[in-house]
Amino acid sequence: MKYSELAGLYRRLEKTTLKTLKTRFVADFLKNVPDELLEIVPYLILGKVFPDWDERELGVGEKLLIKAVSIATGVPEGEIENSIKDTGDLGESIALAVKKKKQKSFFSQPLTIKRVYDTFVKVAESQGEGSQDRKMKYLANLFMDAQPEEAKYIARTVLGTMRTGVAEGILRDAIAEAFKVKAELVERAYMLTSDFGYVTKVAKLEGNEGLSKVRIQVGKPVRPMLAQNAASVKDALLEMGGEAAFEIKYDGARVQVHKDGDRVVIYSRRLENVTRSIPEIVEAVRSQLRPEKAIVEGELVAVGDGGKPRPFQYVLRRFRRKYNIEEMIERIPLELNLFDVLYVDGESLVDTPFMERRKRLEEAVEESERIKLAQQLVTKKAEEAEEFYRRALELGHEGLMAKRLDSVYEPGNRGKKWLKIKPTMEDLDLVIIGAEWGEGRRAHLLGSFLVAAYDQHRGEFVPVGKVGSGFTDEDLAEFTKMLKPLIVREEGKYVEIEPRVVIQVTYQEIQKSPKYESGFALRFPRYVALREDKSPEEADTIERISELYGLQERFKAKR
């Protein structure tokens, strides 16, 4: 299958904002994809090469890409860089450079999707001495044979800036439409495996029956079950039917641990493979998780003086560290608090009631300094739960989780079977969709960021406020560098930004407001932290903001 066909799909997707049209375009394309490409193409449509949980990365920056294009076309690097300043779009500028190509390869052949993908794999797997030169050579060979439109989208895929507006929801619906299968079965299979390539292949070759048989696989992360908020311990008990399992809500990073013999893989909440950054936890899992094969979930907490928990950002620092890891083990010790088990030695436990899963977890784990079971209290008495809550806060934890005793594990679902109880209104995780250039000494920096939540009815991110406080100059420099490649449009000082970056925002209250299409606005929003552990799909939704608004009004009424 020619790559030009995929490039044509990208073009059509870029030209429409309608979700229904995008879904139809993707569905029509998938119908014609040969079986051997079914596991590759869904990721390319999303503007990716590999699933999020795959360790491989292309490791190519803008400068290396420009060099590769210059070698392929004979157009000087400086000319390409000046063109980028004029167009504001690296992909467009690379297409222009390919148009001016000064040498034509005598042996040039049309690019195929397989050749482009195989080249991306070679680029990702080039490591060690001379790897940058090899990456450049592989890409230059692609650009030599690429047409301008193909070059534009190859460049965007390499840099992860596709801008077609296709996210997981559109791809899910397109798979269902293309192969006449139920969208809910596609969703379920994806939530269990986090692998659109595998799900697409099953949908086409095995239909609804095959999708309904999809099971958890060790080595492929399961989408995490999520919780809603409760206003109080009493409200949580009432919602749970009078009895609940209360667990400490740790201020850490949620992880999913996959064990297959001596092979241990640990995924972050965002499904990124963080195994290499936390070797001491890997070793502890090998020795303390008894089953031969298992999938367990827990909260990774950074431990400070006297065993007190440190803010979750310390855990993220561990995740980011690629070198001198031994030093970081000493500086930021970690503790894994396990709270669930999803799979044990060939048996999926997602449909098993929660208390039975807890029993299986206790049987599976040998506790130590590194690995512990989440502290739990099962009770019908509000006063016992209140005392447990008070102790959790005194120890420096965030609050409590309340869980229905009979609840099954629902991957990717945020329902009322799990509830969070915290003493203050919860911060929001929002996506940056716009920004303004600063003034004076900050004129070269982006600031005053427009933040948005996802509106499931509209199928798009809608703004809920502007965040301009809480940033240091270093923060603004980092955000400017991060967001510049994601700028879609500029109008005066304002820039529209592709929704890719998630930040944690605190605020005084949520207000009803006609100012934004969402109907909500944050009062006095303030930046707290970059949420590298969350993808845009995991950010808070308008539905969630509406739920928090209702909780807020109930708090006010009780005063």
UniProtKB/Swiss-Prot annotation:
Q: Which domain of life is it from?
A: Archaea
- What pH-related activity note exists for this entry? Optimum pH is 7.0.
Matching InterPro entries: ATP-dep_DNA_ligase, DNA_ligae_ATP-dep_bac/arc, DNA_ligase_ATP-dep, DNA_ligase_ATP-dep_C, DNA_ligase_ATP-dep_cent, DNA_ligase_ATP-dep_CS, DNA_ligase_ATP-dep_N, DNA_ligase_N_sf
| Active site, renumbered | 249
Question: E.C. number, please?
Answer: 6.5.1.6
According to its UniProt entry, one GO biological process term is: DNA biosynthetic process
Provide details of activity as a function of temperature: Optimum temperature is 65 degrees Celsius. Loses half of its activity in 15 minutes at 90 degrees Celsius.
Q: Which family does it belong to?
A: Belongs to the ATP-dependent DNA ligase family.
Instruction: Give the protein's recorded name.
Output: DNA ligase
Q: Which organism is it from?
A: Thermococcus fumicolans
